[in-house]
């Protein structure tokens, strides 16, 4: 993979987390495989490639790529507005998080505890999802900037759905961090749209 493709895997994962959070908010549904991929990305240490963070297969990120492409194409009929809003908010929150070494330390130790829960219960167990959601509440939710997720209140008010959404936002922010570590910048979304789209078309065609 080229450096740009590596970046797009991580950025596609930010959008994937946003798409899944939006889906839960609107329908109350999310596939176990999708949830597993994003939760698993929080716990991967020392991956060989960026794709290894997401199960080694970018089919896991296809909905995120689709949402990212529609955002870069600026096609009003295809644009997924809420996922785009959530994605940009996650990228912004990651910048704030980067200035908080104390919070990053807390997150690292809490994720170690969650890894132990995963070994005991499995990746998509309610206890693991609740722990990830709780970690988001105790850290990212304390920033002044908040992500307001819009959807059907019948689904948003269910504690399990709320925990899933928070866990996905946490995974999205982790992916935004990876994207930036790989050289990603917000200005690329404005000034390098053509290059990003060409690379994305190639990635989604294969």
UniProtKB/Swiss-Prot annotation:
The protein's name in its UniProt record: High frequency lysogenization protein HflD homolog
Pfam families reported for this sequence: DUF489
Keyword Cell inner membrane attributed: yes
Domain of life of the source: Bacteria
Keywords: Cell inner membrane, Cell membrane, Cytoplasm, Membrane
NCBIfam families according to UniProt: PRK00218.1-2 (NF001246), PRK00218.1-3 (NF001247)
Principal localisation: cytoplasm
Location relative to the cell: Cytoplasm; Cell inner membrane
UniProt feature coiled coil, ranges: none
Annotated source species: Ectopseudomonas mendocina (strain ymp)
Cellular-component GO terms for this entry: cytoplasm; plasma membrane
